[in-house]
Amino acid sequence: MTATDPVANLQTLIRCPSVTPAEGGALSALDAMLAPLGFTVDKVKASEAGTADIENLYARLGKDGPHLMFAGHTDVVPVGDEADWTHPPFAAEISKGELFGRGAVDMKGGIACFIAAVARHIEKNGPPKGSISFLITGDEEGPAINGTIKLLRWAAERGERWDACLVGEPTNPDRLGDMIKIGRRGSLSGKITVHGVQGHAAYPHLADNPVRGMLQLTQALMDPPFDGGTDDFQPSNLEVTTVDVGNPATNVIPAKASASFNIRFNDSWTAETLRAEILRRLDAAAGDGRLRPGREPVKYDIVWADRPSHVFLTRNNALIASLSSAVEGVIGRSPKLSTTGGTSDARFIKDYCPVVEFGLVGQTMHMVDERVAVSDLETLTAIYETFIAHWFANAGA
């Protein structure tokens, strides 16, 4: 096998059953691809009490700047019922021009293509005038506690510094070249508990149904909208994701009700200002007696998730221009610069260097029969190879 072939690279990676938190042999496979190209490869185990140990990988080619990082993850989500798959999820079979397997799109395909692009660049031009590194985690689809955030810290403590980063997530909605992610909205989660008084459903005057209070509070969180969006970001949106009373009986008024929520927020807010606005809405709704005539204000408490994700926007013109021109040069159209969608590990990388995201088409990620067109693997490799040349030319200018 030669590392210049993205299809062979991807088949090797898919055949490693690396469902989070299992490494499945994927990092060893990467080591075998990168070391012959001249990369120095380190495997880094990260641990934290109450979580699974995670194997990560950091590889670097070159010692000088400018320094370009490629970041990604080899862990994948569970396959579900294997009987539902047309082709076995870890067999990496090709059928009718498509390569099937868990991780084909998200995101072993992006890693396979960038390795092939680096190998082709070296084959044609020799090592780049600077450094290229791979920062690969096995904990992106999981809690993301022992993955990219700790690997970045480990590398930085050893003197690693980066000038730019490309994350190979599947950013394209419909066709390869549709979209480059240049930022992400923030994410904040919390859990509200409303306290009532348990009682018999036939004697509501002797109880206090917390569901009524919860309706008031959740409605206040979702309406009115938090904002109308900004020049770079879509409107912030809050969604109630769970509601629970822990009560299997139909004739008992529950003692408490809980609801979890998540808000994806734009650059109109910080996590701190958003918490303040949410508490303002909850306090106002708790004192509104229209749904609870004659009752005291709703008694509630709120617990915030430990680690909010902060909104960010990359404005590094050289990085964005190098990638945009590579896409346009290979496929003939300009990609949209976007901040839509969920979060990714770019939220950690932005604290170290400018970061953008570009990879395959994401239509089948996490689905049964996840697959990628073989032609897209070749095209993405060509885009990545062109990007590498453009970025080093611009960074060294």
UniProtKB/Swiss-Prot annotation:
Cofactor note: Binds 2 Zn(2+) or Co(2+) ions per subunit.
Subunit structure: Homodimer.
Pfam families attached to this UniProt entry: M20_dimer (PF07687), Peptidase_M20 (PF01546)
Protein's name according to its UniProt entry: Succinyl-diaminopimelate desuccinylase
Keyword terms, alphabetized: Amino-acid biosynthesis, Cobalt, Diaminopimelate biosynthesis, Hydrolase, Lysine biosynthesis, Metal-binding, Zinc
Family, per entry: Belongs to the peptidase M20A family. DapE subfamily.
Active site residues according to the UniProt entry: D75, E140 (proton acceptor)
Keyword Amino-acid biosynthesis annotated: yes
UniProt pathway: Amino-acid biosynthesis; L-lysine biosynthesis via DAP pathway; LL-2,6-diaminopimelate from (S)-tetrahydrodipicolinate (succinylase route): step 3/3
Family annotation (SUPFAM superfamilies): Bacterial exopeptidase dimerisation domain, Zn-dependent exopeptidases
Reactions mediated catalytically: N-succinyl-(2S,6S)-2,6-diaminopimelate + H2O = (2S,6S)-2,6-diaminopimelate + succinate
NCBIfam families: dapE_proteo, PRK13009.1
Species per Swiss-Prot/TrEMBL record: Rhizobium leguminosarum bv. trifolii (strain WSM2304)
The organism's place on the tree of life at top rank: Bacteria
HAMAP family per UniProt: DapE
GO molecular function, one term: succinyl-diaminopimelate desuccinylase activity
GO biological process, one term: L-arginine biosynthetic process
Binding site for Zn(2+) 2: D106, E141, H366
